[in-house]
């Protein structure tokens, strides 16, 4: 059983019924993979929820485990911002996502790897 940190873009694609997420995510859950999100992703999802998506968004709490943000994660996010905000345009949300993945030693599943230029962050690939 592995743990995977879902980026907001993957969660949104799943919520909106985009393939291949509508089959991949249920398959992962069936295999008892632990799918997680951060409080930052929770905020991003609820900020952009469309009319009619509210119930689906609330149901995410039933299937996704929420990572806890800690001082260690905050420190690492600050280091990422210091190193990559000017050169790569890394923003606060992505710095927290990367720091959460790094500190907890779990891969990020994202559609935008360019948002994560950090060399010490691993990525989940849905490809075989």
Question: What is each of the regions a protein language model found here?
Answer:
Residues 1-37, 46-62:
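Short, well-structured N-terminal submotif of metal-dependent ribonuclease cores
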Residues 17-18, 48-49, 80, 119-122:
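Residue-level signal for well-ordered alpha-helical positions
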Residues 7, 37-38, 90-91, 112-113, ...:
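Histidine- and aromatic-rich ligand-binding microenvironments
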Residues 36, 67, 124:
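General small-molecule cofactor/ligand-binding pocket signal
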Residues 31-32, 63-64, 104, 119:
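Structured helix-beta-strand junction loops
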């Amino acid at each position: 059983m592995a743990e995977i940190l879902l980026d907001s873009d993957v969660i949104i694609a799943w919520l909106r019924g985009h393939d291949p997420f509508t089959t991949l995510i249920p398959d992962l859950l069936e295999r008892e993979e632990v799918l997680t999100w951060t409080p930052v992703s929770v905020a991003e999802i609820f900020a952009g929820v469309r009319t009619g998506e509210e119930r689906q968004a609330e149901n995410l709490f039933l299937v996704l485990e929420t990572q806890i943000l800690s001082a260690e994660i905050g420190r690492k996010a600050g280091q990422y911002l210091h190193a990559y905000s000017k050169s790569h345009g890394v923003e606060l949300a992505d710095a927290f996502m990367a720091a959460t993945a790094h500190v907890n030693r779990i891969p990020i599943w994202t559609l935008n790897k360019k948002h994560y230029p950090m060399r010490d962050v691993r990525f989940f690939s849905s490809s075989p």
